[in-house]
Structures are given as C-alpha cells and as structure tokens.
C-alpha cells in the first residue's frame, strides 16, 4: 500500500540498536512488535513501553503506519519527528497522537537523545470513516469516551504540550513495564491506560481544539489511500 510498511516491519533498526547496546529499551507487546509478551488481560493494547538514549544514536524509524492509535510522549531530550506533511522537533513534555492511517517517522534521519514513551491501542480501524471500537477494559463513562473519540477523529493536530499529571502517568507506565513478569502488572497497566485517556481528554477539552466532521467521512478514506 503506497510503499509504506506497518510498524511491525520497520522496527528492525530499534531491535538492532538494542542488540548493540546503543539504547535502553523496554516494552510489553503482542504480534510482531518487539518486547516482553502482553497477555490476553490487556487485549487491544499492541505495544506499551519506552526507550532511553543517553548517547548519540545512528538509527531512526522510517515512514510507517501503526495498527492502532499511537500516543508518544517525550520525557527528556529532543526528538526529530514527522507526521504526514509536518516536520517537528519534539521537546520534553510534548505528546503526539497518531491515528492508524497517519504516516509518521521518528528521527531525521536519526533519533535524538532522551527518554521516549509510547502506547499503541488497536481500535479495529484502518480508515478514517470506520467506527472506533475501544478494548472492553477501557472504563471511561460512555459520554466521556464518545467525547474523546470524536475529538480524536475530528482533528488532526499532531503535537500537544502535556502537563505534569501526564508526565507522572507515563513514568508510572515505565515502572509497570519494567516490573511486569508474564502479565503480573496487567491490572496496573489497564488502570494507567484508562488514566492516561482521561488526562488526554482533559488536555484536549482545555485546548478547545477545532473539530472537523469531514475528517471522518468515507470520501476522506478514499482520498488518503
């Protein structure tokens, strides 16, 4: 599909950097995403984790799409990042949101130094017009979840400035990933992901983002692909 691989095929540079001890990496994942294995208790979560680069790097993740919505968060350092037609330099506390059809790359061409977190949730969509199906362990009240879904579907702003609560949440996610043994932290991770989505809703509502319903219609899917 227009020559762009899904993430599963493009994470080889990361795996290689880890094997060369260039970078600290820890993740919980399923399918072909790298990391310790997630259990069925977090079904719908495809990857959650971080990397921490404390020396200059010689690799990057080329253009790719994810099988799910991805939230990135940079705790420290700086990170060249591109999404669709925008090139950015992410700074500490920057958060990015990538929908499954949005092509993006990390590094230009190499990644920066710093600590970088991500979470990928599979919502069973690959195109903008499809309805989002959240995992059944996402427990936001229906009105809140609908509000969050609509905001995420009807705007395409790439980068947000996160607050200390979001930083705290990602730091707790990092600790939960580190100490997980074969799914032992599944409940903790479920709660942290729910908390993150609630904090994200707060952030998006405060920012009063401009919504555009046209971003959800099927002609847009055709236009993109």
Give short role names for the model-derived ranges.
Residues 63, 158, 213-217:
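Pocket-edge positions in alpha/beta enzyme catalytic cores
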Residues 56-59, 208-212:
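Short, Lys/Arg-enriched N-terminal segment that forms or immediately precedes the first helix
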Residues 40-43, 66, 90, 111-113, ...:
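A generic fold-level signal
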Residues 100, 177-181, 200, 204-207:
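A general structural signal marking secondary-structure boundaries and capping sites
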Residues 163-171, 189-193, 197, 201, ...:
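A short, Lys/Arg-enriched amphipathic alpha-helix from helix-turn-helix/homeodomain DNA-binding modules
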Residues 47-144, 182-183:
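N-terminal regulatory/effector-sensing and dimerization cores
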Residues 1-20, 25-49, 105-179, 206:
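A hydrophobic/aromatic-rich effector-binding and dimerization subdomain
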